[in-house]
Amino acid sequence: MYAIIPQQIPQGMRAEVNEKILFAIDSGKDLIPAESIYNCYTGIGGLHNLKQSDFASYHEYAEAKKEFEMGQFFTPHEICRDMVDMLCPVSSEMVLDMCCGMGNFFNHLPNPHNAYGFDIDGKAVSVARYLYPEAHIEKCDIQLYN
């Protein structure tokens, strides 16, 4: 389990930090400690650089933002921990996160071999697979899954 270490990554640097993390993962070398990846990867949510003032209405802005972000929102680490603690899964139970992103919930499960996850964002799936190699994580749209 990775420790939760609060990070203050400025909005303007998040895309760069994410790209460095993805490069490190793709390289196959341990360039960045897994715990740092867990605490620093932010995904695409909030990285759109769109300004509401550039749109005729809030609705148009929200639609453009939604299209860019694919609805991505990573549940904060503390909330994931608290939710898993409340559920108290036992190690023999299988757990499915149908929109797992980078796998924040998996960090708190008693048995990573019984963790299953889907996500449509290939970058987030790469991070999740790196952080939780024992989990079963697929890049797919759950609406199309058979």
Segment roles from a protein language model:
Residues 1-146:
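Class I S-adenosyl-L-methionine-dependent methyltransferase catalytic core
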